[in-house]
């Protein structure tokens, strides 16, 4: 409860800041908190919990008596317009015209209680309870999924921002090189063809920068849409807690922190809400078989009633009192195989749900295995990309010095520069791949609660 209050207050504070323009920067934690409050998938999942819990209450209501109260008033008016003659005891009597009005009042209270219905109530309660738990687990997994999607989208923004910086630095570097080559060609120290070649490289750099900027802007729009904010508004995304530098100690510690795969399998099965939801779906199907078989048994109901009535004034309502009670036993001996069809359908649903549990278990193992493989690959890629940037930086420096001294060609310099840009891109990608892969492992285990 404290957590949800904190989330609501944080979201309200953020919305207030956006509304009054005090701040439009979102950190990763703020983005996830806003997503948990405004993402429509989360809202829908939470709404389904309320519906499922109401069904549980209704199922338990089957154990309670049904009570009803009634009241009535009827007015009867009789008008005999003509006299009538009747013979009675040997004599003849004339009944003159007459008018009469009778008011009839009544009230009653009745109760009906199911004593036994072939275990149908037990099945209904079991189904409703399991479905309620399944809805809760689905909502938990939905929150985990939205948080992971938000984290991935946020990290993708930071990645694209770094790639924009790489493209911008490369453009500036090539522009400076173009100035040197142009000046060198003006004094006759370089060929005019080198100028044209460098100009084409600068144009390609400008194109790459425009493309990188567009990708960055679109990734921001994707995140804003995901967390449920106004896509038309402008936001910045910066989180000082996310560093591009990953030490060797961090790499080694994270590589060994998860333990063996068997241990992770057990942790995942114990924690994954989607697996728990599949198990509860199976439990609901088992209860469904119980309910379907209930028609094979007799049903026993008890009833009682109390009523008041009068054919006079309402003040005399208690003149006639009636009390009734009794038991009713009913047993369907043959219903055209309808019960058998219902049972077979329920058994089939139970089997389908059982297969769903097995499939959910396989999915947990497969997702966990792939997440660990991606994490290990990202760790190795980061180590390699660091070496690549160091080597490419030195190679480009040497190629530039050779070209300036006339000992190297422009092609050698362009090749070295392209290798440096690619190495920088690889480093940026490897950093964010590593962070994302680590969060994916946590998401695959499913232990984090929100």
Segments from the language model and where they lie:
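Sec/SRP-type N-terminal targeting helices
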Residues: 43-47, 60-61, 101-103, 115-143, ...
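Short segments within alpha-helical structural elements
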Residues: 47, 61, 204-231, 387-447
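A small-residue-enriched
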Residues: 33-116, 229, 265-336, 341, ...
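Short, charged, amphipathic alpha-helical segments
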Residues: 129, 192-201, 410-418
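Terminal intrinsically disordered/low-complexity segments used for targeting and assembly
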Residues: 1-34, 84-90, 213-266, 442-450
């Amino acid at each position: 409860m404290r957590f949800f209050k904190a989330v609501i207050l944080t979201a309200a504070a953020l919305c207030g800041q956006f509304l009054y323009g005090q701040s439009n920067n979102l950190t990763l934690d703020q983005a996830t908190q806003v997503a948990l409050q405004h993402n429509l998938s989360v809202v829908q999942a939470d709404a389904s919990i309320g519906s499922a819990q109401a069904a549980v209450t209704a199922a338990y209501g089957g154990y309670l008596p049904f009570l009803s109260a009634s009241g009535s008033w009827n007015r009867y008016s009789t008008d005999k317009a003509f006299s009538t003659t009747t013979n009675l005891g040997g004599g003849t009597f004339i009944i003159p015209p007459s008018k009469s009005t009778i008011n009839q009042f009544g009230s009653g209270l009745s109760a009906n209680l199911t004593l036994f219905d072939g275990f149908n109530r037990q099945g209904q309660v079991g189904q409703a309870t399991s479905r309620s738990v399944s809805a809760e687990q689905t909502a938990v997994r939905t929150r985990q999924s939205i948080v992971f999607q938000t984290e991935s989208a946020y990290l993708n923004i930071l990645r694209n921002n770094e790639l924009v910086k790489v493209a911008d630095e490369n453009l500036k570097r090539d522009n400076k090189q173009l100035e040197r080559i142009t000046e060198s060609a003006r004094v006759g120290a370089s060929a005019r063809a080198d100028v044209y070649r460098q100009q084409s490289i600068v144009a390609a750099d400008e194109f790459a920068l425009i493309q990188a900027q567009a990708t960055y802007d679109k990734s921001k729009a994707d995140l804003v849409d995901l967390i449920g904010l106004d896509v038309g508004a402008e936001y910045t995304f910066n989180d000082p807690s996310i560093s591009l530098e990953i030490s060797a100690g961090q790499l080694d510690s994270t590589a060994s922190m998860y333990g063996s795969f068997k241990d992770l399998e057990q942790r995942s099965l114990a924690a994954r809400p989607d697996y728990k939801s599949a198990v509860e779906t199976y439990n609901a199907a088992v209860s469904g078989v119980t309910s379907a078989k209930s028609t094979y048994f007799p049903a026993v109901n008890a009833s009682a009633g109390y009523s008041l009535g009068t054919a006079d004034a309402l003040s005399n309502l208690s003149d006639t009192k009636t009390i009734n009670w009794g038991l009713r036993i009913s047993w369907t001996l043959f219903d055209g195989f309808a019960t058998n069809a219902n049972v077979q359908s329920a058994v089939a649903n139970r089997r389908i749900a059982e297969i769903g549990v097995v499939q959910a278990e396989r999915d947990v193992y497969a997702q966990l295995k792939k997440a660990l493989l991606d994490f290990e690959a990202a760790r190795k890629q980061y180590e390699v990309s660091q070496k690549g940037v160091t080597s490419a930086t030195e190679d480009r420096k040497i190629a530039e010095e050779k070209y300036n001294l006339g000992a190297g060609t422009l092609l050698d310099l362009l090749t070295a520069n392209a290798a440096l840009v690619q190495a920088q891109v690889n480093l940026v990608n490897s950093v964010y791949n590593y962070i994302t892969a680590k969060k994916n492992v946590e998401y695959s285990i499913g232990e984090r609660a929100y």
